[in-house]
Regions:
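Vicinal oxygen chelate
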Residues: 1-3, 90-126
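Conserved active-site tyrosine of GNAT-family acetyltransferases
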Residues: 20-27, 89, 116
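Conserved acetyl-CoA-binding loop of GNAT-fold acetyltransferases
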Residues: 25-33, 94-95
Length: 126
């Protein structure tokens, strides 16, 4: 039985991994947290007390899996502060678009990280 989504993992070279860490901490608002001492380099980023995004360094000769580009669209985070995030994205020159789903009472912001992964922020506050 599936109980819920645990985390996403994004894998990249070391330089891109550092840039992704900075983006998800400074723009999305995740925080850097504890990560077990794995043999590989990486980070665990947290929303509150839950690790939700893992960043891992690609090993030297690891080939990119071609199907990944064709299947991944976006990750979604529950968020508060629609105006705060809209301003933050504008201030950082990050293109985004806004959407509403009145039937379920949500407002959404969609944008991309520095390597093109889609991000959705879902707001349910009135």
């Amino acid at each position: 039985m599936i109980k819920g989504l645990n985390h996403y993992n994004l894998r990249s070279d070391a330089q891109t991994m550092e840039q992704l860490k900075e983006f998800y901490v400074s723009i999305v608002g995740l925080s850097l947290g504890n990560r077990p001492p794995f043999e590989s380099n990486g980070y665990w980023l947290y929303a509150g007390d839950k690790d939700v995004l893992h960043l891992s360094e690609t090993k030297g000769n690891t080939k990119k899996q071609h199907h990944v580009d064709a299947t991944f669209d976006h990750m979604a985070f529950s968020a508060v502060g629609l105006n705060f995030f809209s301003k933050k994205l504008k201030d950082n020159n990050i293109d985004f678009y806004y959407s509403e789903v009145p039937e379920i009472g949500t407002k959404q912001i969609f944008f991309k990280d520095i390597v093109g992964n889609g991000i959705e922020l879902i707001f349910t506050e009135s």
